[in-house]
Amino acid sequence: MLNADQAELDKFGELAHRWWDPNSEFKPLHDINPLRIDWIDQAISLAGKRVLDVGCGGGLLSEGMAVRGANVTGIDLSEKPLGVAKLHLLETGQKVDYRKISVEELAEQMPGEFDAVTCLEMLEHVPNPSSVITACARLVKPGGQVFLSTLNRNPKSYLFAVIGAEYVLQMLPKGTHDYARFIKPSELARWAKMANLEPEELVGMSYNPLTKKYSLGKDTSVNYLMRTIRHV
């Protein structure tokens, strides 16, 4: 059974043509992308690394890592965002191998073939996030790193990520997030350890509505990122 929610795939598919517009519904992704890429690059030095981007969508992270010199494969199950990602390569001349395949299926085909795996802003959109993490762990080489990000589940995250972002500030379309699918860091760490991944770093990502800027820091109460290493 495919670990995907068709309604979620359809939702992002309908918005796909605006993926690379920094003033569209994807503005938050454009705003956080440099922070995410810098964080990953500092941990593994992307140049020359073979990296898999799981849930790549329209390719913002995938292409950004390719610009830093990584050999990137991007996978997604939504046809339209993948089409947009491929078209954008024609504009920029970057090289990314985009494929429509589930992470679980790719793990059967290419176990242990990547220096690093990224799965950012995706886990809260699938029915079984632990299955995704297990597949990510299988795909990375022993000693390689898996980078994860999602939304914490607590009253503050509901207030900020759902009410604030979708209804008050209208930064995201209404219905972008389902609070019931938000994931506590302790849950993410447990799933990582079950998959033979050791959590090494936990970083929060905060938004300042006055400056309209994002920053990384210690506050993991809403958005957060986790860096893990696969045991040798």
UniProtKB/Swiss-Prot annotation:
> Does this UniProt record's set of keywords contain Transferase?
yes
Q: Which HAMAP family does the record match to this protein?
A: UbiG
Pfam families, alphabetized: Methyltransf_23 (PF13489)
Q: Does the keyword Transferase apply?
A: yes
Task: Family membership, please give it.
Answer: Belongs to the methyltransferase superfamily. UbiG/COQ3 family.
Keyword annotations from UniProtKB, A to Z = Methyltransferase, S-adenosyl-L-methionine, Transferase, Ubiquinone biosynthesis
- Recorded metabolic or biological pathway in which this protein acts: Cofactor biosynthesis; ubiquinone biosynthesis
Q: Which reaction does it catalyse?
A: a 3-demethylubiquinol + S-adenosyl-L-methionine = a ubiquinol + S-adenosyl-L-homocysteine + H(+); a 3-(all-trans-polyprenyl)benzene-1,2-diol + S-adenosyl-L-methionine = a 2-methoxy-6-(all-trans-polyprenyl)phenol + S-adenosyl-L-homocysteine + H(+)
Q: Which GO terms describe its biological process?
A: methylation
**NCBIfam families named among the record's database cross-references:** UbiG
Residues binding S-adenosyl-L-methionine, per UniProt:
R36, G55, D76, L120
Q: Which InterPro entries match?
A: SAM-dependent_MTases_sf (IPR029063), UbiG_MeTrfase (IPR010233)
Question: What is its biological role?
Answer: O-methyltransferase that catalyzes the 2 O-methylation steps in the ubiquinone biosynthetic pathway.
Protein name per Swiss-Prot or TrEMBL: Ubiquinone biosynthesis O-methyltransferase
Q: What is its EC number?
A: 2.1.1.222, 2.1.1.64
Kindly list the GO molecular function terms attached to this UniProt entry. Answer: 2-polyprenyl-6-hydroxyphenol methylase activity; 3-demethylubiquinol 3-O-methyltransferase activity; polyprenyldihydroxybenzoate methyltransferase activity
- CDD domains cross-referenced by the UniProt entry: AdoMet_MTases
